[in-house]
Amino acid sequence: MAAGKRDYYEVLGISKNASSQDIKRAFRKLAMQYHPDRHKAENETTQKQNEEKFKEVNEAYEVLSDEEKRKLYDQFGHEGLNASGFHEAGFNPFDIFNSVFGEGFSFGMDGDSPFDFIFNRSKKRQQQIVVPYNLDIALVIEINFFEMTNGCNKTIKYERKVSCHSCNGFGAEGGESGLDLCKDCNGNGFVIKNQRSIFGTIQSQVLCSTCNGQGKQIKVKCKTCRSNKYTVTNQIKEINIPAGMYSGEALVDESGGNEFKGHYGKLIIQVNVLASKIFKRSDNNVIANVLVDPMVAIVGGVIELPTLEGIKEFNIRPGTKSGEQIVIPNGGIKFSKSFKRKAGDLIIIISYARPCEYTNLELKKLREFIKPNQEVKQYLNTLKNEYKT
């Protein structure tokens, strides 16, 4: 392995037989976690560490998401990639990030909320109108395992920015008529800066710091928004979370984000599923381990099983073994009709609990029923033959 480089599967936290969907899902989660613009670190050292991790995650995804590069890496490791020129060629981690999340995605936090890591609009829209804040809003909500398997409704509360109704988003008393041309840039939005270098004087065009590139200045600040150009409204919205969502997946309301002068952003709601102490998910199936008294397993009888609808009684046959599986068809995740996916199964795995304590009299009676176990007898014969050799 190339010096200093971690295993790409380890970087993404996946196994070597992970599917392309597993790879993409792991990348989306880690890229969101370490994006330099999402969480500004408390110190420069931590910030640099996050940037390095972000670069590492993107590099791992670029290789493992490409069938040919992944095959080369699986066979020869980092050395194989070096020989092919991958590491020397270099790459832009943000290009990879944008290819997955979409062009124009950024987190541009403006300090309102830890969840307001939001997306910029496209370049085309930015050319038409200067938006003083990010239009798209991203929120994170948590649901439990049962809410994931059955689907649920959630009420969310969030703050939404809208253009000020008093100044129509211009930030000045009287709206657009309350603006003057910027005196520093004469309304151009930029100024020419001269800088000396070894090659002589170099002229460069830079954004006007006085008007922030807008070419106009406010004469009198709007009293309603104090020249911010927007006001904040409190929103309450009920959303439907369909059954079967994976943790980290998102719901999108195309016009539920911020608004500015008739332009609406998206509301992106990332859904995180809390782990269950009883159940585990395996694709569409749900798996649960059930403790059973060994005596009940031997003689058969009624046990209580956990299901997604609650605890139910189930009759097990005599001689039920530890590790044996009970499959309840359609007892797993049930998708809505729009998904057109078959419901999964509930898979119960039997595990023996610690035996009960019995009195000497009870133990004496139990010994009367003990008879040679053929499986144990076969094991002992194998053991004896092992010693003979």
Curated annotation (Swiss-Prot):
Annotated SUPFAM superfamilies: Chaperone J-domain, DnaJ/Hsp40 cysteine-rich domain, HSP40/DnaJ peptide-binding domain
A molecular function (GO) term: ATP binding
GO cellular component, one term: cytoplasm
Domain of life of the organism encoding this protein: Bacteria
Pfam families tied to this protein: DnaJ, DnaJ_C, DnaJ_CXXCXGXG
Main location: cytoplasm
Any single biological process term in GO: chaperone cofactor-dependent protein refolding
Subcellular localization(s) per the UniProt record: Cytoplasm
Cofactor: Zn(2+)
Gene3D superfamilies: DnaJ domain, Heat shock protein DnaJ, cysteine-rich domain, Urease metallochaperone UreE, N-terminal domain
Binding site for Zn(2+) 2: 182, 185, 208, 211
Keywords noted in UniProt: Chaperone, Cytoplasm, DNA replication, Metal-binding, Repeat, Stress response, Zinc, Zinc-finger
Zinc finger (CR-type): 151-234
Cofactor binding notes: Binds 2 Zn(2+) ions per monomer.
Ranges for domain J: 5-79
InterPro entries reported in the protein's UniProt record: DnaJ, DnaJ_C, DnaJ_domain, DnaJ_domain_CS, HSP40/DnaJ_pept-bd, HSP_DnaJ_Cys-rich_dom, HSP_DnaJ_Cys-rich_dom_sf, J_dom_sf
Ranges occupied by CXXCXGXG motif repeats: 164-171, 182-189, 208-215, 222-229
Complexes and interactors: Homodimer.
Domain writeup: The J domain is necessary and sufficient to stimulate DnaK ATPase activity. Zinc center 1 plays an important role in the autonomous, DnaK-independent chaperone activity of DnaJ. Zinc center 2 is essential for interaction with DnaK and for DnaJ activity.
Family recorded in the similarity comment: Belongs to the DnaJ family.
Function, as annotated: Participates actively in the response to hyperosmotic and heat shock by preventing the aggregation of stress-denatured proteins and by disaggregating proteins, also in an autonomous, DnaK-independent fashion. Unfolded proteins bind initially to DnaJ; upon interaction with the DnaJ-bound protein, DnaK hydrolyzes its bound ATP, resulting in the formation of a stable complex. GrpE releases ADP from DnaK; ATP binding to DnaK triggers the release of the substrate protein, thus completing the reaction cycle.
UniProt name for this protein: Chaperone protein DnaJ
Organism, as annotated: Mycoplasma genitalium (strain ATCC 33530 / DSM 19775 / NCTC 10195 / G37)
